Amino acid sequence: KEAERRKAEEQNRLLNMIQNQTAGQLELLSQLMDELERTESREQYDWILGKIVVVGTYLKRRKNLVLTQYTSDRNLLTMEDLRQSLAESCDSLKLCRIRAAYYVEKGNVQLNAEDILKCYDTFEWLVERLSDVMQSVFYRVSQIDDVLRISVHIVSETDLGVLMSERPELKVQQEDENEWFVSCIVLR
C-alpha cells in the first residue's frame, strides 16, 4: 500500500512538473484550436492543423524525454534520445510546408538531461517563433570539448534578428539574402 501511494505521488509530481514546463505550448495549442474553429479557408485550416501537430509532437516527445530522464539512474539522456525527438518533430514540420532536417552527433553519449532538454526546447522555440516565415531549417547539435553547440541554418525572407531578439544567447547572422545562421552554446 505504502509503495503504491509513493509511486502514485511520484507520477503526479512528474505530470505536474511536465505540465508546468510546457504551459506555454498548452496555451498555444488552446489558441490554435480556437483559431481552427473560426477559420473558413481550407488552406488556413490545413495550415493551423499542421501547427497543432507540430506543437503536439513537441509535447509528446518532451514528456518522453522527461520520463526517460527520471527513470535513468543518474539523471542522464543520450544524444540518441535527442535524435529521436528531432526526427519526429522535423517530420511533423512537413505539414506546415517547411523542409526540416537535423544532425545530432553520433554516439550514444550520455549527457546531463537538462542539456538535452535545452537543445530540444531551443528547437521548439525556433519553430514556434518562425513557422510562419521560414521555408526550411537545418538544426545541428554537436559536442566540442565537452560543450554542446547548437547551429541552425534557416531559409526565410524575413529579418530573423528582430524576431529572435528576446533570446540574446542566440547569435543570428545573415549569410545570404534569404539565408540565416543561428548559433548558441548550451550553458550548464
Give the ranges of each region predicted by the language model.
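Signal-transmission coiled-coils
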Residues: 1-93, 120
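Flexible, glycine-/charge-rich segments associated with ATP-binding catalytic modules
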Residues: 8, 41, 163-188
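Conserved ATP-binding N-box helix of the HATPase_c
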Residues: 25, 29-32, 36, 110-141
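Structural alpha-beta junctions
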Residues: 57-60, 67, 91-100, 168-173, ...
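Helix-loop-beta hinge of the Bergerat
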Residues: 79-115
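Short, non-transmembrane amphipathic alpha-helical segments
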Residues: 122-128, 160-171
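Short beta-strand/loop element within the Bergerat-fold HATPase_c
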Residues: 138-153
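Acidic ATP/Mg2+-coordinating residue in the GHKL
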Residues: 151-157, 186
